[in-house]
């Protein structure tokens, strides 16, 4: 289809003359350098023809080909972040120095239920992601598109919910720089609109 052959992808090494990082972007106020997005300026940049990937007009094809694996990668990152948040939630819940009304935090209110729900939701996200990855490996991105679309929605939402619960059990400390939770929440929130 000609309309999908209008773009090309070219590798441009960062040390190429004329390539300039104007500034790194922040994510909810957190510096995302060096792995995040940047405002770039390209002034009369020249690269060898060999830097053209796959061939002229095949940029859309490359982008589409990486979407499925990229989304699975992001979901795996979400699951890893949620696992860390759940572990922090559990530790905080049984910390003997954090007691209220004679009970540890896990036994107050709905905290015990939140911990259990988080484990269930996290396992569901993990199994859906593994299923999507297995299907992509065996039958390809196009046939696995439904499973990949499901995890793109489900895994980041589950991770955000679990991180939010972990923040809640940590109280004010959860939104501070004393734990990784606030940063995790900010970066995880960006996964919902990407891809």
Model-assigned labels for residue ranges:
Residues 1-87, 91:
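FAD-binding core of flavoproteins
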Residues 39-44, 58, 64-195:
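Alpha-helical interface subdomain recognition
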